[in-house]
């Protein structure tokens, strides 16, 4: 999360964003346009480009579905692999993600790039120890899930709030146009204070992570309930 790395990420994001927005314009012309699924696809495309150094291509829909099933499994009441159940779909999604990342580890170690996936594959400590394949797979699944899912929810919340407050929508548009450039560098982000205000207020009103499951370290009675 140092500035040189963040600057590099921003530059790698912009062609993906431009491609996504072009797709949106074609899709939205005269049609109903649902923001959430399109944002989810875009943020996953960005995350894989930045953290993996490669586009998902034809695997995009399959990987996106696997992520969704894993997230939904976290709220499953019946945690047993009943066919067709939420937990079973989550386990199947997890297996899909594990196979996807595991199949790419050897190539990343042979020809590493500057992406985070490559760095995890070749990272060594002072004694020359590396992450195991399982370590790399678990890191990548968590990273991409956290990166694209929370970003999607946050951006969707922002768009929802801007739809309710068109005056702020105009203010953000004017602020962005005032930069006078089609692509941004890292220092430009400091020139968008109103954008930051809307982002933070959206996070305050609608948290992207609103449930955190916990369990007690030992049985306890609370408010008449045995936990």
Model-assigned labels for residue ranges:
Residues 99, 103, 182-223:
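Conserved cytochrome P450 K-helix E-x-x-R motif and the immediately C-terminal K′/meander segment
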Residues 9-28:
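Transmembrane helix-loop-helix
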Residues 20, 50, 73, 99-108, ...:
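Generic, well-ordered alpha-helical scaffold segments in large soluble proteins
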């Amino acid at each position: 999360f140092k500035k040189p790395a963040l600057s590099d990420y921003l530059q790698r994001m912009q062609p993906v964003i431009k491609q996504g927005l072009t797709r949106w314009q074609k899709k939205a012309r005269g049609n109903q346009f649902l923001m959430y699924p399109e944002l989810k696809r875009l943020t996953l495309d960005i995350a894989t480009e930045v953290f993996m150094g490669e586009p998902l291509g034809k695997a995009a829909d399959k990987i996106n579905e696997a992520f969704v099933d894993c997230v939904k499994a976290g709220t499953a009441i019946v945690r047993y692999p009943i066919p067709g159940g939420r937990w079973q779909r989550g386990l199947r999604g997890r297996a899909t993600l594990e196979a996807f990342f595991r199949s790419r580890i050897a190539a990343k170690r042979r020809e590493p790039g500057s992406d985070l996936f490559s760095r995890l594959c070749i990272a060594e400590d002072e004694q020359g120890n590396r992450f195991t394949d399982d370590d790399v797979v678990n890191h990548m699944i968590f990273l991409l899930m956290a990166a694209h899912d929370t970003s999607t929810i946050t951006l969707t919340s922002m768009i929802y709030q801007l739809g309710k407050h068109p005056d702020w929508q105009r203010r953000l548009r004017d602020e962005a146009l005032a930069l006078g450039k089609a692509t941004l560098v890292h220092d430009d982000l400091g020139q968008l204070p109103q954008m930051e205000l809307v982002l933070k207020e959206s996070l305050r009103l609608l948290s992207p992570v609103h449930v955190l499951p916990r369990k007690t370290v030992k049985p306890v009675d609370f408010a008449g309930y045995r936990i």
